[in-house]
From Swiss-Prot:
GO BP annotations, alphabetical order: arginine biosynthetic process via ornithine; L-arginine biosynthetic process
Name listed for the protein in its UniProt record: Acetylglutamate kinase
InterPro entries attached to this UniProt entry: AceGlu_kinase-like_sf (IPR036393), AcgluKinase_fam (IPR004662), ArgB (IPR037528), Asp/Glu/Uridylate_kinase (IPR001048), Glu/AcGlu_kinase (IPR001057), NAGK-C (IPR041727)
Record flagged with keyword Ligase: no
GO CC annotations on file: cytoplasm
Binding site for substrate: G62, G63, R84, N178
Keyword Flavoprotein set for record: no
Reactions it catalyzes: N-acetyl-L-glutamate + ATP = N-acetyl-L-glutamyl 5-phosphate + ADP
Broadest EC class assigned to this enzyme: transferase
Domain of life, source organism: Bacteria
Enzyme Commission number, as recorded: 2.7.2.8
GO molecular function, one term: ATP binding
Originating organism: Thermotoga petrophila (strain ATCC BAA-488 / DSM 13995 / JCM 10881 / RKU-1)
Similarity remark: Belongs to the acetylglutamate kinase family. ArgB subfamily.
Lineage, highest ranks first: Bacteria, Thermotogati, Thermotogota, Thermotogae, Thermotogales
Amino acid sequence: MRIDTVNVLLEALPYIKEFYGKTFVIKFGGSAMKQENAKKAFIQDIILLKYTGIKPIIVHGGGPAISQMMKDLGIEPVFKNGHRVTDEKTMEIVEMVLVGKINKEIVMNLNLHGGRAVGICGKDSKLIVAEKETKHGDIGYVGKVKKVNPEILHALIENDYIPVIAPVGIGEDGHSYNINADTAAAEIAKSLMAEKLILLTDVDGVLKGDKLISTLTPDEAEDLIRDGTVTGGMIPKVECAVSAVRGGVGAVHIINGGLEHAILLEIFSRKGIGTMIKELEG
């Protein structure tokens, strides 16, 4: 038992050395947010990353909590072309849940476990400048990222804080916009030229049939979308990953957030547990 523990530490050592001082952007969502054990393990993983000299930045989602709050308030969601319409009232609820509830819970839990976390949203210091997303028709205050101003993030991480970001952006029209958390995380990672972007999902990674694909180049990932291997909700995640890698991010990891300590298992072991997308070296 003791030698197993030593071997785990020895396996992690070269990765701890390699990533010391590097920035990781982690999208927290899916199973990791819903399962108490996974949620607790996520907090522990972030604290450990911080203590090993890595600079973690968290971007979180919260779709199910928004739906639950709307239900509690007796507001029926409206859908157009399969997408939720975010009118002004819905946007207020989105902001209340993401910024006022989920963000503060994550910050509190990190701080209780020895971190120095600060909660912000994309509106703060114009971190995320957004514009209306129109590819699905007019669905209200759903936005896409127009620009990221990362100065506030540099200030926080240089002063040893862990930024926790709710993906609510500010439009040049002064309106708040709800932004997909994967997209927000990818754009933030690109703006920082982060070493890694880690997307926590509800599945083990990119699958071919029931077999996990451990590594992909951006070109290979796009081929899997074209040939129908990658389908449904995994398509936008893979597209985000490809965009991030081509935008200067060292590597993107798509992993199952429902697996306890998924981040540590992916980052600090040779085999990993998910799919890594990166350019070929050399």
